[in-house]
């Protein structure tokens, strides 16, 4: 529907004056000269008078004229319908006595305005578009009282919305079910409060429906995701009959789910996404009450899911059995709490079924894995009758095995994965209560397993013999306890059997060393006739290296295994008592093992000789001693060389662990068909590096991995001496790292620039210390270079964290097919930037991201020194940011204009401070530039907020097929046209449109008419006995604290009487009486209340009729009067800064009077005025008016309770310094 509108201002305002002479005073007998009672002149407000506004609308074949007459604070609207063709003219007659007409230039079409906020009221918004060709409707369901809703989003879809509801019959509609009363939903947050949101977006071409099921009261849900798939959703529910639908079962009441979080609270989420081409169904089974589940994953597979359940009859389905009540599962976490998760994903091409067996109560399970296989799973179980099955024998009660964890608690898991090409089933036997099992692996092999056992009659089976009591074996663990595991893996093509023989009690085995030989290994022996043999070089004296162990002894090893085309035999020679052995491996070989011994007569068989009693073997560990290792593994058909550089003497390196000691390592792995070299640069003496751990000590590492078909070199630059780097950890110490990873077909080089001496960098952590990092990643087919610019010495940068300390970072990410360079400009010295955080400190950041096919450059402009910018935060401090996002097919440049010095901008906030921002977003097929105009100095803008302060914003969004530029326009100044104004204006349907379109504001602000008053008891204890006398004369000099009444220092909870005297009400005259005046709204009660020991406070704005000098005239003052003019009448009035004072004269018995100058005032301006009159005993009285050089004006004729920009606080609030 094409709508054109012509809005014409014909409102001409005229002031009403009161023409009666000034009152003069006869000072000879102290009496005012009384005139006849003045007749009150009231402004004519009939509908035939101005001001009024006329709007002419043309819609299709109909024409409409609306005439609006504002009457006080309401409007009366009349509509006239015009017809097509030859129509009568429409004539409006108006008058003016100023000869001035105000014309406001129309704001540009397509402007979208909205207000997002939170608090205790119901707020909703609809985002409209100027693209009039879209028939769809966007509706915002009214949230329950107290509900807080908001969203930030961008993309290529021309219309976006949040919490929108539509009908089920519209293809591609989005429906958000109204959340329960009191439910809080949101997107980005931080701190110790629970924040939640449910986001759903539907594709215009999808015929299905995306529905968000009602979340139980108190449930917290959220998600953050990105990618190149045009439509994503979270917590979505659809019918079971729709192919590829996604259903999220309503979690039990009290369940907490989330994705991104920080601090010491538990946050969790359950994410499920279905593939459009999968005919099966993905279902999330109800999680037991109190269960916490979450996952984070990445890769190139378009569809992933977590905690998904389907029926057994559907090929390739995935089922997660409901864990026992109280079980805790999770993936990413920090601090000293237990977090656990169980992850399972099914492959579309697998005909079998993956099942997760119920875990015993109290058992903690988890896994982390990566690779290019689209589907992985953990904790899988199958039947014993299928050839090639994998079985995990139930370990003895008390056995501890685990994978990823932190703190001083025990965490446990058992992991098993089946291969897509194996027709058998993978089964995980119930683990005994308290048992901990786990594994970590990586590579391109689709399926790996740990702790597997099968029968002796099945070819290729793997059996783990129950170790003797007291034997210690383990994989991943932390704390001061002993954790144990025995690992064995069978190869699919091996016809023999892998057996782990009971280890003798008390035997300890290990081998740790390092050197300059390209290949090192421990407990490995091969024949001289086999190509690719493994040799153990004698390490240099004093070198310490290790991999797997536990306890208070030092155990060390370096393991390397060659795989692929070796036809020989790997033999593990008996180690002497006290030796510790273990293995971590990766590559393209389907099955690997450690602690293996082969016989000379069996080709390729592996046997583990029973170690002596008391032997300790492990993989990942912790304790109170220093443990170190360097691990490198060559795999597949790699023709290059894997080299472990000899660390300098005294260097400490290690892999995974936690505790109270320093553990560090440097790990490099080559995989696939890479013909290049993976090299770990020798860190400088004294440098500390580490990977995964937790505790109270400093842990650091530098990690580099080459993958895929990359022919280049992955190099970790030697950090400067004294630099501290690290990756994942928690605790109260400083942990930092610099991480770079090359992926896909990138032929370039990924380099981590050596940060300046003293710079601190880090990635993920929590606690009360400063943590910072700089992270750069190159992805997919980008042939360029990703570089992290050296921050200036002393600069602080960081990414995710929480606490009360300042954390900051600068992050840049290149994605898609961008051929340019992503650069983070070096911020000026002293600039503070950051992304996500919470607390009471100032945090700031500037973030820019390039997306999809944009060939340009994303640049973060240097903010001026001292400027403060930020994105997401909460607290009581001011936080601000400037954010720009390029989307879709925009070929231009996204630039964040440098705001002027002193400008404050912000996005999401809460609290009692001012928060402001300016946001601009480009969408659809816009080929122009998206620009955020530099706001003028001291301009304040804002978007989302809550609290007791004023917040404002300007938001512009471009939509549809507009090829131009989306710009936030600075409002033009009001244009005043003077001259002769016609009293009659004629319009017709055939009139030629004017060249300038005139817009009338929908609500012209001229203030709110009225005068406020409040009556109080006189309760100032210091002067009450002298002022409030029951007999004799009032001591007027005793009343010296006039600012007390109406202020926050007042002890009375509320006035005795309060109200507003309107322009048509009686003048506030108080003739001499023993009773209070009869003011509305309760005149009867007031005039029957005695006025002794009472005080009346008046507050109002005086609107100036004409430019002139003015005075306040008071009469009949009985007993004491004070007055304040200007801004101090609103806030800051005191007992000593009053502008007017009069009192009853005890010697003559005459009432007080006087005239007090208010200065020269401009026509139309507003002057704040506060007056107080108090009566001690006997009669009371008071009257006042205003006068200029020519006229006198009644008190209420020009009194206003509020202006367009100012208002008084309620009586009893504000102004604490009354004694100043």
Curated annotation (Swiss-Prot):
Compartments it resides in: Cell surface
A single BP term in Gene Ontology: flocculation
Keywords assigned by UniProt, alphabetized: Glycoprotein, Repeat, Signal
Matching Pfam families: GLEYA (PF10528)
Main location: other
Residue positions with a glycan: 44, 72, 131, 160, 232, 304, 376, 448, 520, 592
Sequence repeat residue numbers: 110-145, 146-181, 182-217, 218-253, 254-289, 290-325, 326-361, 362-397, 398-433, 434-469, 470-505, 506-541, 542-577, 578-613, 614-649, 650-685, 686-721, 722-757, 758-793, 794-829, 830-865, 866-901, 902-937, 938-973
InterPro entries per UniProt: GLEYA_adhesin_domain, Haem_d1_sf, PA14/GLEYA, S_pombe_Mam3/Map4, WD40/YVTN_repeat-like_dom_sf, WD40_repeat_dom_sf
Signal sequence region: 1-21
GO cellular component: cell surface
Domain PA14: 1039-1202
Region 24 X 36 AA approximate tandem repeats: start-end pairs: 110-973
Family indicated by similarity: Belongs to the mam3/map4 family.
PANTHER family, per the entry: M CELL-TYPE AGGLUTINATION PROTEIN MAM3-RELATED
Record's function text: May be involved in agglutination during conjugation or other aspects of colony formation.
Protein name: Putative cell agglutination protein SPAPB2C8.01
Annotated organism of origin: Schizosaccharomyces pombe (strain 972 / ATCC 24843)
